Amino acid sequence: MKPARKGPGRDRRHADDADMDIADTDTYDRNYLDGQLLIAMPVMEDERFARSVIYVCAHSSEGAMGIILNRPAGSVDFSDLLVQLDIIKRADLIKLPETAETMKVMKGGPVETGRGFVLHSSDFFIEDATLPIDEGICLTATLDILEAIAKGAGPKHAILALGYAGWAPGQLETEIQDNGWLHCPADQDLIFGRDIEDKYVRALHKIGIDPGMLSNEAGHA
């Protein structure tokens, strides 16, 4: 994870290398999907996104950016990352608060996989660094939030994602029209819930869809 002290959205690229600053997106435009969940349809051919549930952090005419919620980062452990980043000494790991000990690390997407993004509840905010996304949900991409979590002074709910999913202008809209994604409102239980394996099924049930009956239907709910 690359150390960063600046706010989210600076020095980012779409998957196709086009520039996008999420801090400049039209967050409150009703035509966009900020704060919504994307649920991959069976026709999704890209294995990186098969059966994925993605929280859309930013969406505008300039493109979209989101965090995959149900792809654990394998052997990557949050406490080990704190040690690697010199936020805490290994000998002090025993002193970590429960919120840090249980912090989930996700594969947030295929773009900038060496950079960390913390999706969290809105009870924590850093001026000029935290991006409010939707009611109760924010995104912060600086080391300051990791330091706060390690001290027990961070947000009540949070997940750390390595990398993100990015779409060029109009790309996400096209994928939805091609039945690649369903989208629906998000809730904190789905975003921060610890039952990672069941998030895909739970997201579908949230909008009344039986996964066994899912086919190439319309891409919204």
Swiss-Prot record:
InterPro entries according to UniProt: AlgH-like
Gene Ontology CC terms, in alphabetical order: cytosol
Domain of life where this protein originates: Bacteria
Similarity field: Belongs to the UPF0301 (AlgH) family.
Name this polypeptide is given: UPF0301 protein Nwi_2752
Organism encoding this protein: Nitrobacter winogradskyi (strain ATCC 25391 / DSM 10237 / CIP 104748 / NCIMB 11846 / Nb-255)
